[in-house]
Amino acid sequence: MSKGKINVSVENIFPLIKKFLYSDHEIFLRELVSNATDATLKLKHLSSIGELKGNIGDPKIEIKVDKSKKTLSVIDQGIGMTQDEVKKYINEVAFSGAEEFLEKYKDKDNQSNIIGHFGLGFYSSFMVAKKVEIITKSYKKDPAAKWICDGSPEYSLTKFDKKDRGTEIILHIDKDSTEFLEDSRIKTLLEKYNKFMPIPIKFGM
């Protein structure tokens, strides 16, 4: 198991995300589904050029809500990540230059465009979640990994027993955001933001 800080210079990122990034917290779902779609399209590309052996099946994205546990999960069957890739993409790349950028743009009206510039889409999860887990297994032979962060700059990263390729992001929904545990709310958001996605999305029965 490894523990660490995401980046010493970005300890103010989380409050900035909550306060400034989006006045509309609902956009987190669009960002997570977009990331899941990218991971799945990359898998299909690797398969098409022969870098991935075997049948990848018909990968889909699944959204699950567990009201008793107060969690919302976004699950894909895409390329997944190794532990090293989680460290690189979640803990380092996503924060590259973000603090300075957010400070510059936090008073502007075009806040909805900020996230894509720095790969911060994943971190919009913390607008509605008090804790976020990533469980992921790469298409490579590396063991699966589990990353946990409670909205502070500190995280834990461990090996995990996951057999199937892909990534599951589990949001432990904050008490102020329980609307995102309602099926009707999620259906509305998927209709609004993710209606014409190239990968099928499953939610509900």
Which residues are covered by each model-predicted region?
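GHKL (Bergerat-fold) ATPase N-terminal catalytic module, capturing the glycine-rich phosphate-binding loop
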Residues: 1-175, 179-180, 188
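Charged, low-complexity intrinsically disordered tails
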Residues: 182-183, 187, 197
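TRNA-binding/sensing appendages of the translation machinery
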Residues: 194
